[in-house]
Each structure stands twice: as structure tokens, then as C-alpha cells.
A protein has these predicted regions:
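Loop-to-transmembrane helix entry/capping segments in MFS-fold secondary transporters
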Residues: 69-70, 152-164
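A membrane-interface helix-boundary motif in multi-pass transporters
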Residues: 1, 181-199
Length: 224
């Protein structure tokens, strides 16, 4: 069973090591890539803080608009069906789109769905918005552990991938509390704007720092 089931592809390990060498280049850059990983982890907190709103306050928001609760429940069925159908299609993007680009675009689409909630008043609008959210989820979430593995050394990849799961739990724990507090002090519209700003703000920091690191890496390569 071990021989047949748990074979490890040596070529895959070699390929992953080459990708890591491309990212790190030297020990000098390694600590900077780790800073980027922490920016990604912080962004992941904001993503799941926002996602948890759909599991908590959004049910109340939709029923307050006269939409029956069963319709809210059906949105999660739609989410599951779309992921089952769409995830294999998204995976086919990998030969054509850089992983970091795919994840950044996916998180932005995910964040955009919360901004569009400001204008949602009917069940159709909520369905369209949830489809947009699911597209962002499919495009970004599955690739994050692989991106973390590219940005870290082999001996520390598991540590940071574990932190990714911890940050997800932190975001889900904070989300309902944050949502209830903002709604009590403000409104649902302000809540949607605030989580959009949290996600896009940290995403912009990731993009700027990633651009800076690529510039530094190119300069170091030219100096060799």
C-alpha cells in the first residue's frame, strides 16, 4: 500500500526547489519574502473575517429585506455546486497564469462582491453577488498554500501553511463580533464598505511589496 499510494515524485520536488530558488535567490532576500508571507497571512484574516459575515449577519440582512430564509440556505448549495464544477476549470489556468497573479485577482474579485452588496435588494442580486464571491473563492483560496510553499524554504513551508489555517480561524472568530459591532454603531452598508477596504487595503500592500521585491531581485541578478 505504501509503495503504490505514497510515491513521491522526485521531479516535482526538484521543480518546487527550482521555483523557491527563483524566489529567494539569496539568503539576503529570504527575510524579505517572509515579510511578504506575513502580509498574505494578515490579508487572509480579513478575507475570512469578511466570509464569516455570510455565515452570521447576512441571514438576518436578507430576511429583513423580505427574502425567505430557505433562499439564503440555497445560496450555500449554489456555492458548493459552482466549486465542484468550476474548481477543475480554474486549475487549468496554472500553465498560463502566474500563481501570485491568479490569487491576487481572485481575492480582489472576492472583495468586490462585498462592495456590490451595497446595491443588492432582491434575491436575484444576492445570487449574482454570491456567484461573484464564489468565483473569487475558487480562484484564490485553493492556491494559497502552494504560493506560501513557493515563498518559503522547504523546511519552513509547513509552519507557514499551518499559520494560514490559524489565520483563517482567527478571521472566522472575529468576523461575527466585528459585524455585530459595526451594524450596531453604523449600518450594513458601512459594514460592507469597511470589509472591502480591509481586504483591498492589505491586498494593495501585498502588490506593492511584491513589486518592490521583484525589483530588488532583478537588481541583485544584474549585479552578479
Amino acid at each position: 500500500v505504501v509503495v503504490l499510494t505514497f510515491n513521491v515524485a522526485v521531479d516535482a520536488i526538484k521543480e518546487n526547489s527550482e521555483i523557491q530558488e527563483h524566489y529567494h535567490g539569496s539568503h539576503e532576500l529570504h527575510s524579505r519574502w517572509i515579510i511578504l508571507v506575513w502580509f498574505i497571512l494578515i490579508n487572509y484574516i480579513t478575507v475570512h473575517l469578511s466570509y464569516s459575515l455570510w455565515e452570521s449577519v447576512m441571514a438576518v440582512h436578507m430576511t429583513n429585506m423580505g427574502i425567505p430564509f430557505y433562499a439564503y440556505s440555497m445560496l450555500w448549495t449554489l456555492n458548493g455546486v459552482l466549486i465542484i464544477i468550476g474548481q477543475p476549470l480554474v486549475n487549468k489556468l496554472s500553465p498560463y497564469v502566474r500563481l501570485s497573479t491568479q490569487i491576487i485577482v481572485g481575492i480582489f474579485i472576492f472583495a468586490l462582491s462585498f462592495l456590490l452588496l451595497i446595491f443588492a435588494r432582491t434575491l436575484t442580486a444576492f445570487v449574482i453577488d454570491f456567484v461573484i464571491l464564489t468565483i473569487g473563492e475558487m480562484t484564490s483560496f485553493a492556491g494559497l498554500p502552494a504560493w506560501i510553499a513557493q515563498l518559503t524554504n522547504v523546511d519552513e513551508a509547513g509552519h507557514y501553511q499551518g499559520l494560514l489555517n490559524i489565520m483563517m480561524s482567527v478571521g472566522r472568530a472575529i468576523g461575527p463580533l466585528y459585524g455585530g459591532f459595526v451594524i450596531e454603531k453604523g449600518s450594513y452598508q458601512f459594514l460592507f464598505i469597511s470589509v472591502f477596504c480591509l481586504m483591498t487595503g492589505t491586498l494593495i500592500i501585498i502588490c506593492l511589496y511584491l513589486w518592490h521585491l521583484h525589483r530588488v531581485q532583478r537588481r541583485l541578478n544584474l549585479d552578479k
